[in-house]
């Protein structure tokens, strides 16, 4: 069981909303309207940890260890939404998301294979870590830069915890886990080949609600994410390459193989079905 160890490890590095964020360093002259608007949209997006947690608990009733870890993940992800909202409450209260705007991103996700979802969210944590690090470089106001740097580290730790559960799944389910992880790994490491931002909040998850069945489609400004990535923080091919490299590196360690490209991972995936 991983939950007790992960709980203690996460407790040791948990940051405090009041004490650890340097609220007094705020510089109003270094926050643009454009930047402030994106903070609101990320606060709403992070609120989608709520329906994601409901999905995880529903689809992992067979796994109480992982379900218990969700109590940690949910707490920390909701705190990401909260710290962004606290920033707006203090410095741009006119942009604070309404309860209705937050509730709009809570909807039911269709059931999906638990191992594929685990891998999808592992890759999502890697991607979000890089998005937030890139956002911290784009922002000019020191407090929001610190916030993005702080929550980026959380996302990296979450990815590390998911990797622990992936290792456990290899022991308990063997090839089923290998197939699931390789399949989703090929998809999520191939983002340079698609214009779509490959993150769980930007994927269709409820067929009955299509096309209004991504988290991003239910935000006040659908399409903001692509603009944020492409035109604002400029998450370019260099950053995207770093995401793919981290996914391939971790799968190399997980499978005791060497994947230097998506093509090599895809060949491995095909070999599993042979």
Task: Please report, for each region that a protein language model flagged, where it lies by residue.
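Non-heme di-metal
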Residues: 1-274
